[in-house]
């Protein structure tokens, strides 16, 4: 059986922890009554083994086994570095 590995793309909003980052995933959802599309944000904690991510970087993460109480995602690659 091959399972589909979930991958997400988002922006790093915190890199202050050692070997960990917080990634904000933005999605658009339709309001059930008014029909207007609203921007919703999900924050995910991800494992960054080499501490290579910086604040504002666009990264790709994938789901993995639980690494801590809140961390179940790991960094795949950095799509775009933030402008310094």
From Swiss-Prot:
Assigned GO CC terms: cytosolic small ribosomal subunit
Lineage: superkingdom: Bacteria
Pfam families assigned to the protein according to its UniProt record, in alphabetical order: Ribosomal_S17 (PF00366)
Keywords assigned: Ribonucleoprotein, Ribosomal protein, RNA-binding, rRNA-binding
GO molecular function: rRNA binding; structural constituent of ribosome
PROSITE patterns (alphabetical): RIBOSOMAL_S17
Gene Ontology BP annotations: translation
Family the entry assigns: Belongs to the universal ribosomal protein uS17 family.
Function: One of the primary rRNA binding proteins, it binds specifically to the 5'-end of 16S ribosomal RNA.
Subunit structure: Part of the 30S ribosomal subunit.
The name this protein goes by in its record: Small ribosomal subunit protein uS17
Native species: Aliivibrio fischeri (strain ATCC 700601 / ES114)
């Amino acid at each position: 059986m091959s399972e589909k590995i979930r991958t997400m793309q988002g922006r790093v909003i915190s890199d202050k922890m050692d070997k960990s980052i917080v990634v904000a995933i933005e999605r658009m959802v339709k309001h059930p009554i008014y029909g207007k599309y609203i921007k919703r944000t999900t924050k995910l904690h991800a494992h960054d083994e080499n501490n290579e991510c910086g604040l504002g970087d666009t990264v790709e993460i994938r789901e993995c086994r639980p690494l801590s109480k809140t961390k179940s995602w790991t960094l795949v690659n950095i799509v775009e570095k933030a402008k310094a």
